[in-house]
């Protein structure tokens, strides 16, 4: 249920951003606000405190962000405070990023490897995934020593797991079944 609300809030803000030709700026501003909230215990305490009323919370946010973010972003934040949804801002940001990717015919591919991909490997992976999904691929790379070797790719709900750790687990299961 809340995912639907997150999507609606994100879509509304995205449309405002698009009308003002500020989609990238709004995404950047929202990321900054999310990071500030996540990394500040004081802000979290204020937002969660039942004895601090909504008006005071809105005043605090206005003081904090009035010169740091676009007025429309600030208005959006104040609406979220009013509706008691500000603590879920990160979900709205993620939905807005999804909308951005959809509208620009792009898709995010999460890639895990033990060592960084070489330029040629990265380009080949982007090309193959682009052909498979018929979209521009945004590669998000992560180094993960626990996979031992190989590559793990997640695109949306699709997973391509060519990791050595998974192969070893599969072999172990197969050997245990034979006993």
Curated annotation (Swiss-Prot):
The keyword Nucleus does not apply. It is a peripheral membrane protein. Gene3D superfamilies: N-terminal domain of the delta subunit of the F1F0-ATP synthase. One of its GO terms (cellular component) is plasma membrane. SUPFAM superfamilies: N-terminal domain of the delta subunit of the F1F0-ATP synthase (SSF47928), V-type ATPase subunit E-like (SSF160527). It comes from the Bacteria. Signal peptide: none annotated. GO terms for molecular function: proton-transporting ATP synthase activity, rotational mechanism. It holds the Pfam family OSCP. Keywords: ATP synthesis, Cell membrane, CF(1), Hydrogen ion transport, Ion transport, Membrane, Transport. It is found in: Cell membrane. HAMAP family: ATP_synth_delta_bact. F-type ATPases have 2 components, F(1) - the catalytic core - and F(0) - the membrane proton channel. F(1) has five subunits: alpha(3), beta(3), gamma(1), delta(1), epsilon(1). F(0) has three main subunits: a(1), b(2) and c(10-14). The alpha and beta chains form an alternating ring which encloses part of the gamma chain. F(1) is attached to F(0) by a central stalk formed by the gamma and epsilon chains, while a peripheral stalk is formed by the delta and b chains. NCBIfam families: ATP_synt_delta, PRK05758.2-4. F(1)F(0) ATP synthase produces ATP from ADP in the presence of a proton or sodium gradient. F-type ATPases consist of two structural domains, F(1) containing the extramembraneous catalytic core and F(0) containing the membrane proton channel, linked together by a central stalk and a peripheral stalk. During catalysis, ATP synthesis in the catalytic domain of F(1) is coupled via a rotary mechanism of the central stalk subunits to proton translocation. This protein is part of the stalk that links CF(0) to CF(1). It either transmits conformational changes from CF(0) to CF(1) or is implicated in proton conduction. Belongs to the ATPase delta chain family. This is ATP synthase subunit delta. It comes from Clostridium botulinum (strain Okra / Type B1).
């Amino acid at each position: 249920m809340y995912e639907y609300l997150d999507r609606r809030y994100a879509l509304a803000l995205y449309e405002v951003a698009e009308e003002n030709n500020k989609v990238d700026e709004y995404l950047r501003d929202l990321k900054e606000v999310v990071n500030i909230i996540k990394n500040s215990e004081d802000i979290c305490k204020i937002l969660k405190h039942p004895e601090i009323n909504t008006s005071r919370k809105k005043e605090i946010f206005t003081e904090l962000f009035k010169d740091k973010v676009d007025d429309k972003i600030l208005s959006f934040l104040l609406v979220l405070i009013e509706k008691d949804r500000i603590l879920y801002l990160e979900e709205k940001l993620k939905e807005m990023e999804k909308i951005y990717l959809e509208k620009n015919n792009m898709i995010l591919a999460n890639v895990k490897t033990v060592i960084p991909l070489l330029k040629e490997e990265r380009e080949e992976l982007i090309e193959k995934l682009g052909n498979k999904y018929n979209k521009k691929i945004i590669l998000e790379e992560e180094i993960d020593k626990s996979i031992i070797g190989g590559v793990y790719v997640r695109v949306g709900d699709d997973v391509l797991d060519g990791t050595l750790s998974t192969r070893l687990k599969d072999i172990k299961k197969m050997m245990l079944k034979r006993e």
